[in-house]
Amino acid sequence: MAEAPTMTIEYFAERNPGTRTLPRSVATRAGGFVFVGGQVARDEDGTIINGAIEAHTRQTLKNVSHVLALAGCTLDDVVKTTVWLEDARDFDEFNRVYAEFFPGNKPSRSTLQAKNVVGTKIEIEAIAYKA
């Protein structure tokens, strides 16, 4: 009987000093899929940035892009995002910045309102695919 094919799973470690001690990986590759754990508006030092939703969205998507690069992907490879906004009234401003990062084909997206636990206005998860 032939052996069932196995899927390679690769974990990408947390590098941000502000969250390095959390028990998580920033991304996991399973086959051709890359799952990016929730990213927020932290700068390179791990500090939540100041500013309105536009600044938080821009920093968060830069962080998503950086994590994707660890796995050899770009925002062009993203097929799905999940977004948590702390304030639903920020939806229009968020969308304007989001559209800058996804100018062509847009990934599927779910957007919810939720109280974020780390003091940021937004959190984004992403799923990418690269064969």
Over which residues does each language-model region extend?
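N-terminal presequence-like segments and the immediate start of the first folded domain
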Residues: 1-62, 66-76, 85-131
